[in-house]
Amino acid sequence: MCVKNTINLYIHLLKPFSLRKLFMKKKYLLLLLLQLCLCGHTFAQYPKMTKLLYGVAYYDEYMPYERLDKDVQMMKDCGINVVRIAESTWSTVEPQDGIFDFTHIDRVLNAMHKGGISVIIGTPTYAVPTWMVKKHPEILAITPSGQNQYGARQNMDISNVDFKFYANRVIRKIMEHVKDNPAVIGYQVDNETKSYGTSGPNVQALFVKYMQAKYKTLDNINKIFGLDYWSNRINNWADFPSMNGTINGSLAAEFAKFQRQLVTDYMAWQAAIIREYKRPDQFITHNFDFEWRGYSFGIQPDVDHFAAAKALDIAGVDIYHSSQDKLTGAEISFGGDVARSMKGNKNYLVIETEAQGFPQWTPYPGQLRLQAFSHLASGANMVEYWPWHSIHNSAETYWKGLLSHDFEPNPVYDEAKTIGKDFARLSPQLINLKKKSDVAILFSNEALSGFKAFGFGWGVRTGYNDVLRQFYDGLYHMNISCDFVDPSSSSIENYKVLIVPLLYAAPDSLLQRLNRFVKNGGHIIHTFKSGFSDENVKVRTTHQPGIIEEACGIYYSQFTVPENVSLKGDLGLSAADKKINTWMELITPTTAKVLAYYDHPVWGKYAAITENNYGKGIATYIGCLTTSAVTDKILADAVKKAGLWNEDQQLSFPIITKSGVNQKGKTVHYYFNYSDQQTSFTYPYNNSKELLSGNSVSKNTAITLMPWDMKIIEVD
C-alpha cells in the first residue's frame, strides 16, 4: 500500500508532464525510487520506553500574551516531561501557499529542550488553511449532506490529490526542519483521522475501481448485493451510481468498508513519509478516538483500528469520560484495552484525556490521580492532557485544560503535581506493564456496518456498541481482564473465553473458525443476530444462526419484538432483572440445554438462552436483549467454568482491581475505589509492598480505600 501511495503521489506531482518528460525529470525519478526503497524495507517498530511520560498538548500559537518560559517552569513543577505540538496549526506553519514559518515550533522546541521536556510533533493535516480552500474549493469533502463549508476541522476529502499534494509538502517541510532536534521523541500522524463521510465524484470513481478489482464483473456485483431489487441493477460500469443515495444496506456496508480503507491507506501514506526522515530513536503514533456520545463510548465505526495501527510504531488513543459522581473508570478501561490490543497486547499512549474539560467534567479531589493511574493499570506508558491551558476563543473554549483561563495554579493543577512526582518516582516499577488476559471480545467493523443497516428496526436507538459495552462493562465490574480481537487476529485461539456480540455479518470461514474454537475446548458466548448474513451482508438461506448452529445446537427462523416478555428459568434473579426488551429470537434447541425460556403465553415454548457442549468446549447462545443482571450472570458462569474465577473476582465494582507484570518480573496489583464511600477488603496475595506509601503488606491484611482512593501493591 505504501508503494501504491508513493507512485500515486509522484504521478500527481508530475501530472502536467508527458510520460517521456516525466522520466527526463531525474530528480523526481530519483525521489520516487528512494521512497519506494524506503517503503519496501522500513517497518513499524515498537519503541523502547524507559520512563513513564506525563504530558499535555501545548499551543504557543493560541496564547493571548507571551508566557512560554513561565509555562515551561510550571510544567517542570508539575512533573510534565512531554508535550505534543503543531497538529492543529497548518495555517500558522504555512500562512500562504509555499511560504513556511516555523517560529512557533522553534520557540517551543528550544524552550522545551532547555527545560528537559520532550516533544511529540503532530502533522497539521486535519485542519486546512484558508488559502488552500480558496485555491482548491474541491478539497472540501462532498458528503451525503452536500459539500462542506470552510470553518470546521476535518472538513476535507482525504483522498483529494490536491489536498495530498499540500499535505505531503507540509509534512516534508516540517520533518526536514525538526527531525534532528534532540527534543523530538516522536510524531503523531494526523489527528483522530476518519473519512469524514467523503463521498464526492472522485471518491465514487475510486469506489468503482475498488469494486472492479474486488468483484471483477457487474454480474457478480448484481448477484452478491441483490441489485435486481427496486431496479437497482447495474449493466454498465459507466452507469455505476453514487452511493450517497443507495437504499441497499449491503452495498452501503461495502462503501463504508471502502471508506475505512481510505483511512488506513491515508495513515500508512503519512507514516511512510515520516519514516523517511525520523531517527531510529523516534516513534510514529496516532491518536485514535472512539464512537462519541458526549464521551468515548464504543468501537469507532469509521476506522479499522487494527488495520490502521499496522503503520504505527505504537498505538495512541484519546479517552474522554464522565466525571464527578458519574466517574466509573469503565471508559478508561475500555479505551485502554482496545488500544493495547491494537498492536498485539503492546503498551500504548494516552495522547489526549481530560484534565478539567466541560463544566460537568471538573473532577472531585482525588479523581485526577485515580484516572491517571487507571490508565497505567490498563497498560498505558503515557498520560497526556488536552490541553495545557484553557483556550480563550472558538469552538473548544470551555473544553478546559490543566490550567484554567487565568493560567494560575488551581486544585487540578496541584493534584497533577502529585501525579507527576509519583510517575517519576515509580516509573521503574510501573512502566511497560505486561498484561495477560484469558477472556477476549471479538468485535467486527463489518458486523457493525451491517447491523447499522439491518439493526433492530425503525426507531430503536440501541446499536452495536450498546450491546458490546453491556458485555464489556459486566467483565469490568467483575474485575475480569479482557482483550479485544477482530476477525483478522491470529490470537483468537489463545483465549479460554470468547465473547462475540452481534456478529451480524461474517464470512463462512470466520464462523467455521469460531466453531473450531469451541470444539477445541473454548467457551464462546454468542448473542442474537449473529451468523445472520455473510461478509457481503447478504442473509444466509439456511436456518439461523447459520453456520454457528452446529456449535450452538440450536436453530430458529422467526424473531419478533418482545412485549411484556420475561425469562423463565433457574436464574436466581428478580422479576425486574428477568425482563427482556427490543429483540427476541424464537429458538428451537437440537442438542443444546435450555438455560431460560420465554415467559409468555404464546412464545413460552421457545428457548431464549441456551448452552451446548460441542467437542471439548461450550457454546452459549443468548437469543434476546436482556438486562445487565442476566448478562453478568452468564459471564460469571462462563468464567467459572473456564477456571478463571479467582481472588480478584471476590471484589467487584466500585472496587476495581487490575494487575500485570512489570519489567522487573514482579506482579503489580492496582486497587481503585470508584465511589464516594470508604471501603475495605482483605489483601489475598503474599508479602508485598504498597508503592505509593512504601509500606509492607502481608497476606490477609485489611486494606482501606478512602473515597476516590487507590493503592498500588507490588508482590515481593
Language-model segments: which ranges?
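N-terminal carbohydrate-binding accessory modules
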Residues: 43-82, 95, 110-111, 429
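Short, acidic/polar
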Residues: 62-77, 296-308, 364-372, 487
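Aromatic-lined substrate-binding rim segments of carbohydrate-active enzymes
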Residues: 69-76, 84-148, 270-278
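Polysaccharide-binding and catalytic clefts of secreted carbohydrate-active enzymes
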Residues: 148-325, 329-332
